[in-house]
Amino acid sequence: MVAVLTWALALLSAFATVQTQKGFWDYFSQSSGDKSKVARVQQQKLTWEPTSLKDSLEQDLSNMDKFLEKLGPLSGQGREPPGLPHDPEGMRQQLQEELAEVRARLEPYMAEAHQQVGWNLEGLRRQLKPYTVELMEQVARRVQELQEQLRVVGEGTKAQLLGGVDEARGLLQELQTRVVQHTGRVRELFHPYAQRLVTGIGRHVQELHRSVAPHAAASSARLSRCVQTLSRKLTLKAEALHARIQQNLDQLLEELSAFASAGAGGAEEGANSGPQMLSQEVRQRLQAFRHDTFVQIADFTRAIDQETEEVQLQLAPPPPGHSAFAPEFLQADSSEARSKLQARLEDLWEDINDSLHDRGLSHLEEP
C-alpha cells in the first residue's frame, strides 16, 4: 500500500512542481486533441472538490480505482480511464507504468525547482551566519575580559596573604564584587546581539519568501504558511539561545561567588593555598562557560540547517529518483509512514487544486 502511495506521491509532486513552469502547460495543450477538449477538461478540474481526493486516500487498496478515476482527467484526455485489472498486481504494474512515463517528462522541472529553492535557502543560511559568528566572538571576548579582571584581583590577594589576613580577606571580598559587576555587564552586552539576531531572522526570511516564490511548487497560501512557520521556529530558537546564555551567566556568577567566599574563608583560617585554588577554579569556570555557550550556538546553527532543509522538501520536493525523495516513506510499511504520505498528498492536492483553478480561469477568459 505504501509503495503504491509513494508512486502516487511522485505523480502529484511532478504536477505540483510543473505548475510553476510554462513548459508544462505547453506540453499539456499539445497532448490534448484540440483546444475545446482542453477547455472542457479545465472546467472539469474547476468543479472537483478537494475533499474528494482526500477522502479517497483513506480507502483500502480495493478502492484505488476510484483514486485513479480522479487522476484520470489530469492526463488531458477528457475521457474516463480505461478499465483496470482487478488483480492488485496488475493494477500496481499499470499504475507504475503510467507514473514512470509522466515522471520521465516532468522530472527535469522538479529537479530545477528543487535546486532553485535550495539555492535561496542556502542564501538565507549565509545571511544568518554572521550573527552567530559575531555572537561567538563576543562570548570569547567577554570571557577573556572577565578572566583578566579577576586575575588581577587574584594576584593581589596572593601577595597580600604574605602581609596579613585582613588585607587578603578584603581583596577576596572585592573579588566577589568584581564578579557581580562584570557578569552583569556581560549580561547587558549580550542583549543587543540577541535582538539583532531575532530582527535579522525576520527580515531575511521575508526576503526568502519573495525570492523563492517563482520557483516553489507550493501554492501561494502554503508557501506563506511554510515561510511563517520557518520564521516562527527560528525566532523561538534564537530566543531560547539567548535565554540559555543568560542561564550560563547566572551559573557562572553563582559558582565564582561561591569560590570567592570559600577563598575568603580559607584566608581567615590562614590557608595559603586558598587564592591559588581560587585562581585555578576561576579559569576553569570561565572556560566551561565559554565551551558550553559555544556548543549552544553551534546547536542553533545546525537547527537553522535542519529547518531550511525541511522547508526545501515542503516547497519543492526532489524528483522521485533523487536520494532525498521521501526516504522515510520507503523504509517500512508503518502507520507513521502512511500518515506522512497522506499529509504530503493533501498538501500537494491543495497546490494542484489552486493551480488548476487559477489556470482554468485564465484559459476560460481567453477569446
Curated annotation (Swiss-Prot):
Disulfide bonds: none annotated. It is found in: Secreted; Early endosome; Late endosome; Golgi apparatus, trans-Golgi network. Its main location: secreted. GO terms for biological process: acylglycerol homeostasis; cholesterol efflux; cholesterol metabolic process; lipoprotein metabolic process; phospholipid efflux. Residues 1-20 form the signal peptide. The modification Phosphoserine is found at residue 56. Gene3D superfamilies: Apolipoprotein. Phosphorylated by FAM20C in the extracellular medium. One of its GO terms (cellular component) is very-low-density lipoprotein particle. Pfam families: Apolipoprotein. One of its GO terms (molecular function) is cholesterol transfer activity. Keywords: Chylomicron, Coiled coil, Endosome, Golgi apparatus, HDL, Lipid transport, Phosphoprotein, Secreted, Signal, Transport, VLDL. The keyword Phosphoprotein applies. Residues 71-90 are annotated as: Disordered. It comes from the Eukaryota. Belongs to the apolipoprotein A1/A4/E family. Interacts with GPIHBP1. Interacts with SORL1; this interaction leads to APOA5 internalization and sorting either to lysosomes and degradation, or to the trans-Golgi network. Minor apolipoprotein mainly associated with HDL and to a lesser extent with VLDL. May also be associated with chylomicrons. Important determinant of plasma triglyceride (TG) levels by both being a potent stimulator of apo-CII lipoprotein lipase (LPL) TG hydrolysis and an inhibitor of the hepatic VLDL-TG production rate (without affecting the VLDL-apoB production rate). Activates poorly lecithin:cholesterol acyltransferase (LCAT) and does not enhance efflux of cholesterol from macrophages. Binds heparin. PANTHER family: APOLIPOPROTEIN, APOLIPOPROTEIN A-V. This is Apolipoprotein A-V. It comes from Leptonychotes weddellii (Weddell seal). The lineage of its organism: Eukaryota, Metazoa, Chordata, Craniata, Vertebrata. The gene is APOA5.
